[in-house]
């Protein structure tokens, strides 16, 4: 229901997934007093986005207003839910309290300062970020298995396995920005020397912008 609401109001069904992905680790760090936090890659640099942080291997969780408020798209999740309950028939009667929405909201600043948790670092500044090699590592060491079929909108079987919204998310981004999942994958693999530019172009023509099931 939240994903449908976010699609209708923001054009982004993936919104709640991103909120949880970004904020949940910080909540856990506060709970267990973990001061050193690593995310995987800075997607803004590895794929496409704002290059403002290209020389900074971390995000400042206290001072960076884009991190604090930007992901919320100007609307705290509780306000969005209140709007949905009042205006959307499919959300009528939904029971949702603050604790239900905790991990969709940024952590408390004062608690972060008190515990000395103020930054999250990106692994791609310390190790070469190679998505294909990351997959091989996980397959060898954690038993990760690829999908039997490729991910929608691209050719790989080991990326975009998070949930069933991925294909739809990348399709929406493709029709809005002309940037799909396949162009991200091919660009990285061309830079990593795994495929040629011509091979990448052929893959993009075949898979980028694929309508999801």
Question: Regions from the language model: what does each represent?
Answer:
Residues 1-213:
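Nucleotide-activated chemistry modules centered on ATP-dependent adenylation/adenylyltransferase
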